[in-house]
Amino acid sequence: DPNVFASVYSTLVTQLTAGGAKGVVANIPYVTSVPFFTAVPTNPIPGLPSASAGQLNTLFGGINAALAGASLPPRFVTLVADDGNPATVEANPLLIKDESLPNISAQITAALTPVLGGPTAGYVGSIYGQARHASNAVASRDYILLTARAVIGTSQTGAPSPFNTIGVSYPMQDNTTLTASETAEVKTATDAYNATILALANSKELAFVDANAALNQVANGGLVYNG
């Protein structure tokens, strides 16, 4: 809460400067410049074996069709198979869970029951009801937390094959990802916090470091000295 932050930060700075002490304060960088949120790309999955790619594309194509039937946009892209050429690098997006999406578990189950049978279709519906492929588009960019790297491509305990590969056929959980809407909310809060920090730096005559601008420059080309 920006108001709580303003109250706590103001109290802290007032206490630290009560005896006439001077110092330096820095603001807070945007998460879009912090390596913890940017080091893992949205498409770290290499080209898949042809059979796996075909199987998943059929499944995700069926779900996209169910989405279209519900007048909802598609959530899955066509996955790329490994072409066997070591000179080329294929990349596929992560499969993630987005809790902001309408849950279409029931629609998926109904659409796939004639093909997969009730139990399997029910399971598929339960794990893909709010699943989608991660986006790298500017307007809808997802950010994958660095801690997620350790689980990408591993097997989800208790999930049956072939629906158990995390980030490929089993969705990364919501707490491993910042969606575009969540990133926008964090930016709004960061702007409010930084306004408080700058105002207090000015009122208390403290030196101010714009860490947000500096890290943004590092993230977008780097800092250049003497050249």
What does each model-found stretch correspond to?
Residues 1-12, 21-30, 208, 216, ...:
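Mobile, glycine-rich extracellular loop/lid and propeptide segments
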Residues 31-203, 211-227:
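Acidic, Ser/Thr/Gly/Pro-rich low-complexity segments that form flexible
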